[in-house]
């Protein structure tokens, strides 16, 4: 039932709602729906599939990783958003960088990012991953993981709550909805 409602939202020939642009549309049911056809753009279909099956690669480096585990636990249950944690970068399309990134770990982060298939997205979780955090002036700390990999969503906090990470994932889903895969 949920898939049909989602596909109804993606259709390019929706039900008339009495607005000005619906004047030329027939007042009855949608004729394409009556025949069993659903029309949509390829971009909308791909983005719908991508938002419903985001598989993050966890890159937990410090205390933010504990909150990331809380987000995957039963209270918030990221599975209901289609988010399933994967153990391999080759199986994931989202990387969650959680915690302090040091200079010695930066090449490993880049290598894991490069192993992910396209399209790929990065969520930076916590003050340390966003800009160095408490250890910003330490000689061995990278002042933000965006110096190593491109970041799509920043989740602030020290450590951010599990709810903040869920909100960041929902923001990433909105960002994916706005992307265009097929060039016009």
Curated annotation (Swiss-Prot):
Signal peptide as annotated in the record: none
Required cofactor(s): [4Fe-4S] cluster
Subcellular location: Cell inner membrane
Keyword Iron tagged: yes
Annotated GO biological process: aerobic respiration; electron transport coupled proton transport
Source taxon at top rank: Bacteria
Binding site for [4Fe-4S] cluster: 63-64, 128, 158
Pfam families from the UniProt entry: Oxidored_q6
Annotated catalysed reactions: a quinone + NADH + 5 H(+)(in) = a quinol + NAD(+) + 4 H(+)(out)
UniProt GO molecular function: 4 iron, 4 sulfur cluster binding; iron ion binding; NADH dehydrogenase (ubiquinone) activity; NADH:ubiquinone reductase (non-electrogenic) activity; quinone binding
Primary location class: membrane
Disulfide cysteine pairs (residue numbers): none
A cellular component annotation (GO) from this entry: respiratory chain complex I
Protein's membrane topology: Peripheral membrane protein
Manner of cofactor binding, per the entry note: Binds 1 [4Fe-4S] cluster.
Keyword tags: 4Fe-4S, Cell inner membrane, Cell membrane, Iron, Iron-sulfur, Membrane, Metal-binding, NAD, Quinone, Translocase, Transport, Ubiquinone
Subunit structure: NDH-1 is composed of 14 different subunits. Subunits NuoB, C, D, E, F, and G constitute the peripheral sector of the complex.
NCBIfam families, per database record: nuoB_fam, PRK06411.1
Similarity field: Belongs to the complex I 20 kDa subunit family.
Protein name: NADH-quinone oxidoreductase subunit B
This protein's encoding gene: nuoB
